[in-house]
Amino acid sequence: MTSGSKAHPVPATCTMESPPLHLDMGAARSSVCTELTIMPRPLAKSLQDSIDSNFPIDEGFQSGGEDEDMRRLFCNILPEVSTAAVDAPFHYTSSLPSKGVRDKLIGGLNIWVGASPKALDSVTSVVVDVHNLSLMQDDVEDNSPLRRSRPSTHSIFGIDQTVNSSTCGIVEVLRRSSEMQNPAFLKIVIEELRSLLIGQSLDLLWTHQISTPSVEEYLQMVDGKTGGLFRMASKLMIAQSESSNMNPTDLDALMTLLGRYFQIRDDYMNLTSQEYTKSKGFCEDLDEGKYSLIMIHALENCDHKSRVLLDSMLLERRATGAAGLGHKELILSMMQQTGSLQYAVEILSVLFNEIFELVELIDRRTGKVNKPIRDLLAALEIKKDSPRK
């Protein structure tokens, strides 16, 4: 180091054998040689103070110049950036028209649970947000063009930004959950989020591998993918209620059966409902190559020639990324021939009756007749030989 240079004493020095690095900051500032240092700093001391103490301005440095502006830009702590970009996809999804089924379900469950309005708001907020975030991911994974009759989120913001936004949204849900006074809140959210993602992974696996699951495997997938969100709602409500004498097991069973009913109903409506065609496109599940209960039944009950046709069309769908209109119409006619659509209606009827019996059981145990839940079930019921809606 030359005699004209200032020596900067540095504790805990890590010296490199190579020549020191010279930073030319312009003619107004002399060359400065620094050694690579690793130095602990008190947490209370600002980063700017640390920079100033380790790298003092040379005597030849003139304040107000271009170099000082550069130093302020690169060495100062900057304000936090706007979250507008990461929030926009989620806000768009949340703004899409919805029938509010989950809001109605939570409101109905509270007839039994008796959570406070504040607790109810916190549960509804988390459950609805998780639902919308899962829709964003579902549409990316299924390459769905429409969601609730509007362009899907990733078709507007792109896949990368949509995935990033949904991931950030999950982190935000976990942050809010961790700030609740009840420690069980976060545990429940994590537990059922995990169930949801594991269930979704099975759905994706079967589609990717073109592998037909058993009915039992299908139900296990649904219990995670769809039932997880319903159980999250009921468990959070009980955890937030100070006066509930509810048996959690009763509600767990009800929510799991409701999840199965919702998923099978959704699969059926996707193939038969004009309203669903307008909202998501004609038989969109066939574009996805989805192994719904109806598809599983058709594959297991068709003759050999039809099975070869179905398997071949599923292979072709994976190659092209979608099913053609003619393919969809052919698959639909084969499902009708095997009685698969009617089979789904019969299963829905069995589930509906079981759900209604559970509702009556909980009514008796709580001493409260739950009309909102009954009204919701009546609105969702699909009766045998129901016409195309």
Swiss-Prot record:
SUPFAM superfamilies hit by this protein: Terpenoid synthases
Binding site for Mg(2+) 2: 138, 142
List of residues binding Mg(2+) 1: 138, 142
Top-level enzyme category: transferase
Residues involved in isopentenyl diphosphate binding: 99, 102, 131, 148
Transmembrane segments: none
UniProt subcellular location: Cytoplasm
Cofactor(s) needed: Mg(2+)
Gene Ontology terms: biological process: alcohol biosynthetic process; farnesyl diphosphate biosynthetic process; geranylgeranyl diphosphate biosynthetic process; mycotoxin biosynthetic process
Binding positions for dimethylallyl diphosphate per the UniProt entry: 147
GO MF term set: (2E,6E)-farnesyl diphosphate synthase activity; geranylgeranyl diphosphate synthase activity; metal ion binding
EC number(s) from the headed UniProt entry: 2.5.1.29, 2.5.1.10
GO cellular component, one term: cytoplasm
KW Transferase (keyword) present: yes
Keywords in alphabetical order: Cytoplasm, Isoprene biosynthesis, Magnesium, Metal-binding, Transferase
Family stated for the protein in its record: Belongs to the FPP/GGPP synthase family.
Function noted in UniProt: Catalyzes the trans-addition of the 2 molecules of isopentenyl diphosphate (IPP) onto geranyl diphosphate (GDP) to form geranylgeranyl pyrophosphate (GGDP). Does not catalyze the conversion of dimethylallyl diphosphate (DMAPP).
Protein name listed in UniProt: Geranylgeranyl pyrophosphate synthase A
Organism for this UniProt entry: Phomopsis amygdali
Gene assigned in the entry: GGS-A
